[in-house]
Amino acid sequence: MIEVSGLSVRLSGKSIISDVTFAAKAGELTAIAGPNGSGKTTTMKAISGELAYDGSVRIGGDEVKGLKPWQLAAVRGVLPQASTISFPFTVREIVRMGLTSGLNLHPDKSDQAAAAALASVDLVGFEGRFYQELSGGEQQRVQLARVLCQISEPIVDGKPCWLLLDEPVSSLDISHQLTIMTLARNFCKRGGGVIAVMHDLNLTALFADRVVLIKSGRLAAAGSIEEVLTDATMLSVFGCALRINQIPADGTPFVLAHSALSCP
């Protein structure tokens, strides 16, 4: 479990996150959503150990700020919102970086691991291409393949591992959005945990178990999809009169964006 309690972050003397509390369970996909600039990425960076914070963030009972970088790398992989690489690395070289930063449970099968990770994100045959030559969506999938090489198994020594994904489908077409979200969902089904910053509320409703809504750096709501995705909460958090409907087959909520045409 990842337990976030009283999380607060200040950057350049300004409060960005204030007193955020929630828990993410292994075996579940927890989505973090909210308006632009609400503090979602800052929250994720604090959870991953990239930013100093007040309060508590625990992974498997261990305080994140007390763990060394190599200890964090062994239990969580991070997909950043954007990645800029100055040197002309090939796709293969980028993906293999994940093998050097994680546990690399099978060092004798490094090439196979890299190939399998690329195949899982639909990039077979891209190994020799230069990263800078790829489209934004292709680069995003390369970075996810790197993360999958770092955290290759959802459970290691009886303890769950985590994928921390910041807007993992923001640059992807609908087909690859479904591919990546299904991959994340399957990681959870195998016992691992996923926290993903999401903007698409319908993908969130389709794939997430729980959702955390952040507004202006504070927790606005947290709970199951059915508990959080309500007309009243959408109006309160996003300022839009969004209508939440349900798919007849299984009752999964979905957001009817057309209902917000009156949104200022």
From Swiss-Prot:
One of its GO terms (molecular function) is ATP binding. It holds the Pfam family ABC_tran. NCBIfam families: PRK13548.1 (NF010068). Disulfide bonds: none annotated. It is found in: Cell inner membrane. It comes from the Bacteria. InterPro entries: AAA+_ATPase (IPR003593), ABC_transporter-like_ATP-bd (IPR003439), ABC_transporter-like_CS (IPR017871), P-loop_NTPase (IPR027417). GO terms for cellular component: plasma membrane. The keyword Ribonucleoprotein does not apply. Residues 2-241 form the ABC transporter domain. ATP binds at G34, P35, N36, G37, S38, G39, K40, T41. It is a peripheral membrane protein. Its EC number is 7.6.2.-. Belongs to the ABC transporter superfamily. Heme (hemin) importer (TC 3.A.1.14.5) family. Part of the ABC transporter complex HmuTUV involved in hemin import. Responsible for energy coupling to the transport system. Keywords: ATP-binding, Cell inner membrane, Cell membrane, Membrane, Nucleotide-binding, Translocase, Transport. SMART domains: AAA (SM00382). The complex is composed of two ATP-binding proteins (HmuV), two transmembrane proteins (HmuU) and a solute-binding protein (HmuT). SUPFAM superfamilies: P-loop containing nucleoside triphosphate hydrolases. The keyword Translocase applies. This is Hemin import ATP-binding protein HmuV.
